């Protein structure tokens, strides 16, 4: 196992191909909440550190792939104004960019 988190696991399948699996434990759906975002960042770092990975297959352990952001977490940030929203959103944006910037092919397997 390359990374074993509560929302994401990364494991080598074969021939340099790893599975990057979203499966938020304790929830019926995958969503981008704070815990998932932190796990996402750690999983990306684990992939970057593993030179044996030549490609990623992104999968989901749920019947829906990912439903999106956890809007229940928006309220406290929105109540604090524009600066709080930017301060909260930009690091998340950077994490998604770091996934995009991984220098290996990525394929999403959505059924």
Language-model region placement:
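Structural preference for beta-strand elements that scaffold enzyme active sites
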Residues: 17-19, 66, 107
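Conserved CoA-thioester-binding segment of acyl-CoA-metabolizing enzymes
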Residues: 1-59, 83, 94-97
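Glycine-rich beta-to-alpha active-site loop
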Residues: 93-111
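Generic beta-strand/beta-sheet core signal
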Residues: 59-60, 109
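Glycine- (often His-adjacent) and acidic-residue-rich active-site loop
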Residues: 60-95
